[in-house]
Every structure is written in structure tokens, then in C-alpha cells.
């Protein structure tokens, strides 16, 4: 029968070891995400998958924040983050650094997540949008591609931290399948 792992069996990295460890070449960009709980959850998932960072834009809350810390469980201390006053500035900086920028949004001519194949030679940035308005159209326009999560229900809407986790995992899954 399966037995739950004890904390000491999980080989968890401390913050210093995490900072020094190689990261997956994926940055999550939060475009005016208003809920500090969503921000904290995204930090926690980015830590779980050892991503390169989280970039916070516009009205998105930034550390230090008691509420971010509560949801992130301290991941805001391990995951590198930057703040930009606009998401457009963040996208421009990412493109200047050679990242492929992918907005996660429901759009005409989007690529379904199930059809997306990453290029292992590329570094990626995922733009996650505001809880009500999604990714701003000017950011979608500036993106290299748009990824859409297939949905079959009545709402066609997912919580931004849940959607971020779904897409992050697909990137991690594909990198692992390539042996990276």
C-alpha cells in the first residue's frame, strides 16, 4: 500500500540551494492580476517546478506581502521576481532577452495547449491575465503566440492560478519528455 512521504524524504531544497539550482527556462508574467492569493499560488507553483521566475505587472501585488506569503508558503523568497509598471514593458524586455512570449488566452487563431509543442532550444514566457478581463489586447498583439486551454464546460473560464498551473505543468511535462 502506498505510504505518504515524510518531509525529510522529499529532498526539498533550501532557499540558497534553490537559488543556485538550474531552472527551467520559463518565466510567468502576471498581467494586472488583482488577487494576492492568486499571486501567491502562482509563486508556489513556480517554485514547485523550479521555474526561472515570475514577473509582476501593473496592479499585481508584489512581495513583501503577508497575504502573498500565506499562499506562497515562502516561495516568493525562493523564486526570482521582477516588477514592471506595465505588462508591455515586461514583454519588450523579454523579447529583448530572446524569450518567446506566449499569452494564455481565448483568441481567434490561438494554439490549443494540447497541440502546442515546445522548442527545447527556446526560452519561454507565459502571460497570465487579469481575473475578469484576461490578457490585455495590446499584450496579446505583442505576443509571439497565444495558447488556449481547451475547455468543455459552461463557463469557459478558469481561475488564473489554476490556468497557470495547467500550462506550467504542460511545459514541464514536455521538457521532461525531452530529457531536460
Spans of features found by a protein language model:
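Post-transcriptional modification and biogenesis factors for structured RNAs
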Residues: 1-180
Amino acid at each position: 500500500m502506498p505510504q505518504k512521504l515524510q518531509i525529510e524524504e522529499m529532498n526539498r531544497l533550501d532557499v540558497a540551494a534553490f537559488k543556485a539550482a538550474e531552472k527551467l527556462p520559463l518565466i510567468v508574467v502576471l498581467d494586472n492580476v488583482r488577487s494576492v492569493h492568486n499571486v501567491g499560488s502562482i509563486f508556489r507553483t513556480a517554485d514547485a517546478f523550479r521555474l526561472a521566475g515570475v514577473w509582476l505587472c501593473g496592479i499585481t501585488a508584489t512581495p513583501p506581502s503577508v497575504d502573498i506569503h500565506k499562499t506562497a508558503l515562502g516561495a516568493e523568497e525562493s523564486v526570482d521576481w521582477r516588477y514592471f509598471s506595465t505588462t508591455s514593458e515586461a514583454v519588450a524586455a523579454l523579447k529583448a532577452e530572446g524569450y518567446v512570449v506566449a499569452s494564455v488566452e481565448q483568441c481567434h487563431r490561438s494554439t490549443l495547449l494540447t497541440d502546442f509543442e515546445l522548442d527545447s532550444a527556446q526560452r519561454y514566457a507565459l502571460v497570465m491575465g487579469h481575473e475578469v478581463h484576461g490578457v490585455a489586447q495590446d499584450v496579446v498583439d505583442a505576443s509571439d503566440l497565444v495558447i488556449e486551454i481547451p475547455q468543455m464546460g459552461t463557463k469557459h473560464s478558469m481561475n488564473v492560478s489554476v490556468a497557470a498551473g495547467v500550462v506550467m505543468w504542460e511545459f514541464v511535462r514536455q521538457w521532461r519528455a525531452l530529457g531536460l
